[in-house]
Amino acid sequence: MIKNSLVITFFLFLLSGCASEVDKRVDTVLSISGANRTDLETVLKHYKHEPQKLKAAKFLIANMRYHHSYYSVKNPRQHPLLDSLTKAADSLFYHSVYMATDSFHNGNIQKLIDSVRIGFRKQNDVRVSEQSVKIFWKEDYDFNWITAKQLINHIDHVFEWKRQMNSVRRLSTEDFYEYVLPYRSIPDNSLTDFSDIYFAFMDKYLKDLDKDSVQNVVQRYNFVINQLCKFFPLYPYEEEIGYQELFFYGFHDCIPIASYGVSILRACGIPAAVEFNACYKQFQGRHYHGVVLDKNGNWLAFNPESSIPTSDNSSFDTKDILNIYRFMFSEQKDTPFFMEKNGEYVPDIFDSPFLKDVTSHLLKTIPLILPYRETGNNNLAYLAAFNSGVPSGIIPVTWGKINRTKQNVTFSSVIPDRYYFPVYYSPFGKSFSFGEPFYLDKDGKIIKSHIEGKVDDVTLLRKFPVKQGLVDKAVKLIGTVIQASNDPGFQPCDTVGIIADTLQPYFQDIKLDMNKGPYQYYQIKTTDEYPHAALSELEFITDIRYGYENVIAASPLPILSSGDTLSEDKTEVRLMDEPLERIKWKAEYDGNPQTSPEPYPTIRFMLKKPQFVTKIRMMPLNADNGIIAGNQYELFCWNNGEWKKILSERARYNYITVSIPSGSLLWLRNLTGGKEELPFYVDSDGRQKFIYP
């Protein structure tokens, strides 16, 4: 009995300690809330006889300290016409759907919706932009502006779900507070509407569903949003307006899409959160997505408006992403925001008190301990990943705590099969290396490149590796034939050429057999196994000595080495079946290596009279990441925590020659065009080896 009493006493002590801590934080927020203190205290007094709601109110107020954003000062005259039209569209769509009693996605329902939508747009497309919206924005901390009425309405609404829904009642207190109760889903994101608005808009579409099936709920949400935005033209305004943005195409990126999706699902009783990946392995940018908590306690990832969560997350592509962070409403004490030493620089991506690393729910992660022997007072070091979309060329993706006694740093959440740059930051935000960049293989083994002191002359041909998917398409073009005939129906025809090898991602020639020529009609015919003309550029080459009038200058073949400069054939010209200006709309003649007539099996070239075509100069569909003559390039070398420029040059040919220390990690930038870039080494055979193949 004594032992049990001690346990109970200790538990009550913990509870009182937690309560005391929350009360202290509430008092702190009240002390800095100025004129709005009365509103916040009104909320606490309102719930003094409802202990559960009082605890919820304290949780929200205690965590307001760092929540800050633009918010909308609403008034009835803000956008009355838009309010009227969106309500009308919502009502028309809702009644169209529920006039039928069979499947929500039945084709007959879709026909009815389309009919109603067409009529609505005829009447209102022009009206939408007749009246400009007048949004009055202010920027402030939440504790300075959220009113008692807004907070009480929100808390009452959320607790009504707790009363009605078993799934909400089953949630732990922590999950309820973090994933249903919050009035915002992304910190610092503009706040225009609260849960009562979102509920009134969406819940009527969900009443016939079992909300334990989060997949069905998300599928219905996606259907509703994708249908309603067809009732309006492209977004005509220059600023945010609130949830009515969902009625339009053309304004959203993934951030508001995720924010609205999660906020609306929460307002309808579905535990949800917004997450983002720090960056990608090879590409610029990052992505925000949603997650929902299913009845089995599993977090399922999805993209609001465009994808449905699956029970094993197999539909969510994770192969190219770095660490995943979830936005919480409460302060997360194990983040750099709180762990930094006074004056220590925290990278922008981690300068938030609301981040939680949740990478392991979608990807394998491992702990990693690295040596750290740098001087200074930093508490934190970082593993960064390459990203060409930021000036520094790197983005920190995870943090580690420095142990100066053991001279190491421990990272708790590191993804294998990724390339990392170990860095720390000065108080002014300058990055420095505390180790050489390395690849962490799938087994968690660190692999480093050996950098030698000698200087080598190397030839660079690309700024980004050839994409395997495009290589696969080029391989499938093997067996494609070039046929020629003097009959427009190609009956009969001669096979005058064939693609016998894998085409490289630049111009190359296929020689044609003209022993029976000349011919009036030519066609490139793909195989039955792969009936797709994935050829980005085509030129039909003839000899200038034939004296044909329907010719223009041919594009040069690539010059990939100094020896190629001697091989130019000045007798080659391009034969035309129509003036270039008339055919530039065609993918194979538009000058863009990234487009092709891939949907079609055949490309035809129809002359006015028989003429000799000696070669076809062709290029397979490709990402255009080779060196382009005439483009301006910069070459950087990784050195002690930063990319240092070692070359700036306008490419004369399709290669660049430079002297570099053997084994150096390099980054080649095209300043003229294109975004895809990736660091590389040059191996002992002079070949570029990108950090990801």
Question: What name fits each language-model region?
Answer:
Residues K406-F421, Y425-F428, K516-P518, S659-S662:
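Short Pro-Gly-centered beta-turn/loop motif in secreted/extracellular proteins
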Residues S31, D39-T42, H49-Y249, G285:
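Secondary-structure boundary elements
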Residues G453-Q508, M514-G517, Y530-K615, M619-I628, ...:
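Disordered, acidic Ser/Thr/Pro-rich linker "stalks" and the adjacent N-terminal cap
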Residues S16-G17:
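C-terminal motif of bacterial Sec signal peptides marking the signal peptidase cleavage site
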Residues R25-G34, T42-Q52, K111-D114, K204-V224, ...:
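Hydrophobic/aromatic-rich core segments of domains that either
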Residues Y425-G435, D528-A534, T672-L678:
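Short acidic/polar inter-strand loop motif in beta-rich domains
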Residues K364-T375:
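A short, amphipathic beta-strand motif
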Residues P427-G453, F540, F680-Q688:
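Structured interaction patches on ligand/partner-binding surfaces of diverse proteins
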